Structure formats: structure tokens, C-alpha cells
């Protein structure tokens, strides 16, 4: 009986560590024990090196929420002084870390932006004439912090678009383009302003009237959801 109680205590202490501190240590502790904490699909990444303190100057971890499957869903922000940043999303249960996601298939977007930045003015004009919206591409790759700021600054316009879309979808999507977004649409009854992405790897803003209608985050669809502000009906989202 005593051994069982001791084991239960040790296991509860282990589970309790799957929190902000544990997620932070994955990226800052060279001796992080992946064999203990990596579960599910993360077992395939035991040989991966997650230590990032030598590559990034700032590492922040915040809890985005939880779901019926995961007790903790975390946002990890890695940033360097040269402006490079990376947003990661970690899915954990009480006994360990089960999945890690980020916005995928961004290589072609990065290449287009890099090519545009070194192009001549004539070439840039040609690309714009072909329909390339470089500001839209930059928004797709923007950090979550920058996207949340963009969303807050334009929330009133988002609401106007929501109203306009009910009356005239074509007119609404013309306004959407002026905001450097891709398009407006309804998906499963929720109004979305899509910034863009490749195939199913999309970033955008979602309007949710009732929190009960908010989709659950998961490694297989909505990899992140974050409200613009405490009383906002708008959420930043990313999918995979």
C-alpha cells in the first residue's frame, strides 16, 4: 500500500510538470529528457534537437487553452535580434508532450518574398500586374504577435465586412483585398477572413458569436486559436 502511494505521488509530481516551465525547458535545457516526456507521435522525434537558446535571443511560452483530448495546448515564440521569429504549437496531456505543429509548407511563400525584395522596380511592377500581393504574403508569414496586432487594429473593419458580406459577397471581397487578405467565406457556420496559405495550411481570422461554437484545437486541423482581446468575437487561427 505504501509503495502504491509513493508511486502515485511520484507520478502526480511528474504529470504536474507538463506545464509552461516544462515546455520552456524543452527549448532551453540541453539535458531535457525527451525519452521521459515525449509520447505518441513525438516518440519519432527523440533524436531531434529542440535546444534553441543558441539560435534565438528570446523564448516565450503561453498556454492557448485545452481540448477534450489535450490538457494543455501551448504557444512557443522564438525570436532573434535580427527579426527572425518562429511560432510553434505544442499539444500535451498530463503524462507528456504528444505533438508539435507550425504553419507548414511556407517555403514557396518565403522564396517569393525574398525574390520580390531583390527584384528591380520593373520586375516588381510586373509581379504586381500578375496579381502578386506582397503584403498579403508577408501577412501569411507574420508572427502571431504581429497578426494579433493587425487584427486588433482592423477589428472594426472586420465587423463591417461581416455585415457587408450578408448583403453583397462580391463587394465584401473587394474590401477584403484592400486589407491584403485573400477572401471572406463561411466555413461550418463560422465567418472567416482568410489571409492565405498553401493547401490546408491556412492562417486567418474567425468570427465566433458564441464560445460554444468555437472549434477545438488539435494537431490535425486548428493548430492554434487565439482571441484578439477578452471581449472580442474575433480569433486568429491557423490550420493544417
Residue ranges and their predicted role:
Residues 4-12:
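Sec-dependent N-terminal signal peptides
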Residues 17-46, 133-163:
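Core segments of small alpha/beta cavity-forming domains
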Residues 18-22, 69-85, 94-95, 121-123:
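Alpha-helical protein-protein interaction scaffolds
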Residues 40-41, 51, 112-130, 134, ...:
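C-terminal luminal/periplasmic domains and tails of membrane-associated envelope-modifying transferases
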Residues 48-88:
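Surface-exposed, charged secondary-structure patches
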Residues 140-144, 154, 174-211:
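Mature extracytoplasmic/lumenal regions of exported proteins
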